[in-house]
Swiss-Prot record:
Top-level taxon of origin: Eukaryota
Classification via Pfam families: Acyl-CoA_dh_1, Acyl-CoA_dh_M, Acyl-CoA_dh_N
Cofactor: FAD
Known pathway: Amino-acid degradation; L-leucine degradation; (S)-3-hydroxy-3-methylglutaryl-CoA from 3-isovaleryl-CoA: step 1/3
Subunit structure: Homotetramer.
Residues the entry annotates as binding substrate: S172, S220, R221, Y275, D282, L283, E284, R285, A405, G406
Cellular component terms per the entry's GO annotation: mitochondrial matrix; mitochondrial membrane; mitochondrion; nucleoplasm
Protein name: Isovaleryl-CoA dehydrogenase, mitochondrial
Alphabetical keyword list: Acetylation, FAD, Flavoprotein, Mitochondrion, Oxidoreductase, Transit peptide
Amino acid sequence: MATAIRLLGRRVSSWRLRPSPSPLAVPRRAHSILPVDDDINGLNEEQKQLRHTISKFLQENLAPKAQEIDQTNDFKNLREFWKQLGSLGVLGITAPVQYGGSGLGYLEHVLVMEEISRASGAVGLSYGAHSNLCVNQIVRNGNEAQKEKYLPKLISGEFIGALAMSEPNAGSDVVSMKLKAEKKGDHYVLNGNKFWITNGPDADILVVYAKTDLTAVPASRGITAFIVEKGMPGFSTSKKLDKLGMRGSNTCELVFEDCKVPAANVLSQESKGVYVLMSGLDLERLVLAGGPLGIMQAVLDHTIPYLHVREAFGQKIGQFQLMQGKMADMYTRLMASRQYVYNVAKACDEGHIIPKDCAGVILYAAECATQVALDGIQCLGGNGYINDFPMGRFLRDAKLYEIGAGTSEVRRLVIGRAFNADFR
C-alpha cells in the first residue's frame, strides 16, 4: 500500500485542460463538489487519501472539460491525459509493482473508477475498458513474456488498451461469436469483425476473443483469447460510432481481414478463452459498477447546491418537502449502491468472488443511477432539460450501464440461475 501512495503522489505536470465556456447565468453556488463521508463507507486512511488525491486532480483537469467532450464527441487531449493517469499510478492499479503497477485491490480500482466517472462518465468508461478489461486480463492470464512486453506501456499511459468480445449478432449470446482464428504455422489468421468496442478507435493493444474451433460442443470450448496490436497486417477499425451517451469514449467496429496474429499472442491457452472471458466478466461487472456510483455522486454535486440557490414562492426550493424527498431518495440510492459495491469489492480482494453479487452490484447501481439522473433533471426543472446544464449527460451516460457488461436482464438471469443451482 505504501508503494501505491508513493506512486499516486508523483508530481503531475502543470498541463491543465481549458475551462469550458460558462453556461447560462447560473449562481456560482449552484454547483459544488459535495464531501464524501468515507468513515461511513468503511475506508482506511490510505483509501481515503487515494480518493482525495485522484478527485482533486480530476476536478481540476477533467471535470471542466466533460461537457465539451460530450458535445463534440471528442476528447482532443486523450493521449496526454492518459499519460497523466499513468503518472498518478492508476492505469495499472491492480497490476504488480514489478510491471509498473500499484499492486492494489479491486476496492481501490472501484474508487478510482468512481471518481473518474464523477468527473466524466465517458472518460470513466474508457478508463474501465483500459485498466480492467485489458490490463487486468493480461495481469491475470498472460505469461511472463506477454506481461513484460505489454504491461509497462499500458500502465504508463503510452498505450491505450481495449477488449473485443461482442459482435453484431453476438452480444449477450457471446459464445455464438463468428470471428474465426485459423492456425497456420507459428501464427493465427483472424477473419471477421467485432462491434461496440470501447476504446476501439484509440487502442494500441486489444484483448480479442475468436473461435479457433467452429465445431466444438459446447461452442464455448472453441473460443481463444488473443492479444492484438494496432498495426498488425489485416487489422483495421471503422469510423467511430455516434452514441446516445458516453460521448467522447470512442467506440467502433473492428475488422479482421486475414489478420496475422503470432501464436505467442494467445492469452492463456488455445480453446481456453471462455475461462478467461467468464472469470473476467465477474470482475468487469464489479469494477464498472464504480461508474454508476460516480455518475450518481455527480448528480448530487449539481442538484443539492442548486436546490439551495434557486428560489420560488419566496424561498429556496430545497425547503419544499417534495424536494426534500427527492434529495433523500437520491442520496439513499447512492449510499445503498455504494455500500453494496464496496463490500463486494472487499470480498473479491479476499478471494471471495461470487458471480451473482458481481452481477448484482452493477444491476442495482446502474438502475439506481438512471433513476437518480431522472430525479436530478426533475429537480432542476427547465434547466435540467437544456444542454447548457449537465443533467441530460448524466442520464445518457447512466443508461449505458444497464446495457454494457451484460444487460440488466442478463444480470438478473445470472442471479436467478445462481439460486436455482443451490437447489439442484
